[in-house]
A protein has these predicted regions:
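Terminal, non-catalytic protein-protein interaction segments that mediate quaternary/complex assembly
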Residues: 1-263
Length: 263
């Protein structure tokens, strides 16, 4: 069987989240290569997929036409999304293997304590760092043009372990404050994901990043001594190393595209 050779990179840029979602679903289904993941799940996959939503605060997914689709993603339920978005401000895991807000706001540091007998370096956990309040916000207050306002969810000591079974998909964010064409200062966020299920998870990821975006803007404005201009929400961009759709969702994703006139 001849295997589809997917493009080395894919770029999608749309004004709002609905056309961005439909476009990337169409590209994964039509151009994606069939790949069995490490758990044995068959997927259609595109690598190195960049999706930009220019006005992510416009949540226009409520008017999607589902019809008789068997599986509706959880992000289609606004009550679920209200609870999911709370992840962005969480500081504890509450029994989950990871929580994005917690990994950003209570990120454990590692302290070098010496060498072991076999000359391997030994580390122990240090204090937890709130990367939002202790670093990203102060960095932006110090200089709005910084390129160093980054945060990580991937805790090396825990997740870079061959025995780890559940690890974050969203691994890094970068925040950039830049003016738009009208001169209005906007806070843009790019999220880097190692793995991104585009049908069932991508829209929820954007919503969570939007919560972070709004929180960071609020904290910058509330910082004593901030003398910069007011910030508005800007672009949200996701960069997905593996953008995929599971085989069990191929048919439903295809029906959604047809229902929306893209089939």
């Amino acid at each position: 069987m001849l295997q589809i050779q997917s493009p080395p990179a894919t770029v999608v840029s749309r004004t709002t989240i609905q056309p961005a979602l439909l476009s990337v679903l169409n590209k994964v289904l039509s151009l994606g290569a069939e790949v069995d993941d490490e758990r044995g799940n068959r997927t259609k996959e595109l690598r190195n997929v960049t999706v930009t939503v220019e006005k992510p605060w416009i949540w226009n997914l409520d008017n999607l036409v589902w019809g008789k689709i068997m599986f509706r993603p959880k992000w289609a339920d606004r009550e679920f999304m209200k609870a999911y978005e709370l992840q962005a401000s969480a500081t504890t895991r509450n029994g989950h293997p990871y929580v994005y807000g917690t990994e950003l706001r209570a990120h454990p540091t590692l302290a070098y304590v010496g060498d072991d007998k076999d000359d391997s370096r030994v580390f122990q956990r240090g204090h937890a760092v709130d990367q939002i309040s202790e670093y990203i916000v102060p960095k932006l207050v110090e200089n709005l043009r910084t390129r160093r306002a980054v945060g990580f969810t991937w805790n090396v000591a825990e997740f870079s372990d061959l025995k780890a079974t559940e690890v974050p998909c969203l691994d890094m964010i970068q925040v950039l404050a830049r003016p738009d064409k009208s001169g209005t200062e906007r806070l843009h966020i790019t999220g880097v994901l190692r793995s991104n299920e585009m049908y069932s998870a991508w829209a929820a990821d954007v919503a969570l990043i939007l919560e972070l975006q709004e929180d960071i803007i609020g904290k910058v404005h509330a910082t004593p001594g901030y003398r910069g201009p007011p910030l508005g929400c800007g672009l949200i961009t996701t960069v997905s190393g593996s953008a995929h759709i599971y085989e069990e969702n191929w048919e439903d994703a295809g029906h959604l595209l047809m229902n929306m006139g893209m089939g």
